[in-house]
A protein has these predicted regions:
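Active-site beta-loop-alpha junctions enriched in small/polar residues
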Residues: 36, 63, 85-91, 159, ...
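Catalytic domains of cell-wall/extracellular-matrix polysaccharide-remodeling enzymes
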Residues: 127-207, 211-214
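Bacterial Sec-dependent N-terminal signal peptides
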Residues: 1-24
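Active-site gating loops and adjacent loop-to-helix segments of metal-dependent hydrolytic enzymes
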Residues: 96-123, 237-245
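Acidic (Asp/Glu)-rich catalytic clusters
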Residues: 46-52, 69-81, 98-111, 145-146, ...
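C-terminal domain-boundary segment and adjacent tail
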Residues: 182-185, 240-294
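Active-site beta->alpha N-cap acidic-glycine motif
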Residues: 23-93
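Conserved, mostly hydrophobic/aromatic
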Residues: 35, 82, 154, 221, ...
């Protein structure tokens, strides 16, 4: 009987090891959708992605008027890992937002109208106080928690919150305090998505990027989905780096992401889809380390 138990234990151990080993051979892919809650058109696009059922991470902007809709949407999908898209700038000419903590609490972060500056350059040209940056980022986290969101990670809108080593240290401090992961802190390999690809070539671009992935590290695809609606097409980026016809680019990226061809490719046995909740459960918060670059 003793030997039977030993053999059974060995067999189960072998099966478990084989399963883990087989999983280790797969290329891990993590898709992160940014700017959720920015506007209604982005939220509707996010819903299309969520309806595919794939594990996905979605980074929420708590400052925007459509944040409340995003909260109600995200609560309905167990396949999503929710992050806070820490925001310190407001880049649209016709559509501006300001701090969660109130403009009087963080006067060095806002312009004369109480809105965030449009870019990192203009923000840091105003010599923002580190204490105010911490106050504001904390307020954004607290707002998300009060809304009832289960937050798994932090990231940063247009890199403003990690512009300097000092501001990055604030993000790290808050992540440790709230026991949250930070996007790009697990040695993720950044794979440029299709955002800047020509509108007509989004799908082909993304298919090629996935097909040519090589083993080594979790592959991070950051995407910006939306619908080409009057709401989105009216937005004009105050930063020159943004693509023209932004709403068409976002809609094309959405179409590529939810297309049957791309979804079928993602389900190829050689790949393993995961989100930040899954990644953190596998590696633990203690495995995070500051990346060499933003």
């Amino acid at each position: 009987m003793k030997y039977v138990i030993v053999i059974i234990t060995f067999l189960f151990s072998s099966i478990s090891f084989a399963q883990k080993d087989k999983s280790a051979d797969k290329i891990p892919i993590l898709i992160r959708c940014d700017d959720i809650g920015m506007c209604h058109s982005v939220n509707i696009a996010a819903r299309e992605v969520l309806e595919t059922g794939i594990p996905v991470s979605m980074s929420v902007m708590v400052l925007c008027p459509w944040f409340t809709e995003a909260v109600e949407l995200l609560k309905n999908y167990p396949n999503v890992s929710i992050g806070i898209h820490l925001t310190l700038n407001s880049e649209w000419k016709q559509y501006r937002w300001g701090p969660a903590s109130g403009s009087q609490a963080v006067p060095t972060l806002v312009d004369s109208l109480g809105n965030f500056f449009p870019s990192r350059t203009s923000l840091f040209g105003n010599n923002p106080k580190l204490s105010e940056i911490e106050t504001e980022l904390r307020a954004q986290i607290e707002k998300a928690l009060r809304a009832g969101l289960k937050i798994d990670y932090l990231d940063y809108h247009m890199g403003a919150a990690v512009q300097t080593p000092e501001t990055r240290a604030i993000v790290e401090k808050l992540a440790a305090e709230y026991k949250l992961a930070i996007s790009r802190y697990y040695d993720e390999v950044n794979i440029e998505g299709g955002y800047f690809a020509p509108i007509a070539n989004k799908l082909d671009t993304m298919l090629v990027k996935v097909r040519t992935l090589q083993p080594g590290g979790t592959k991070l695809f950051v995407v910006h989905v939306g619908l080409d609606t009057p709401e989105m097409s009216a937005m004009e980026d105050l930063n020159p780096v943004g693509p023209k016809e932004m709403s068409k680019h976002r809609n094309a990226e959405l179409n590529a992401l939810v297309s049957p061809q791309f979804q079928q490719l993602l389900r190829d046995p050689k790949y393993r889809l995961l989100n930040y909740r899954m990644l953190t459960e596998e590696k633990g918060l203690q495995a995070m380390k500051r990346p060499a670059a933003n």
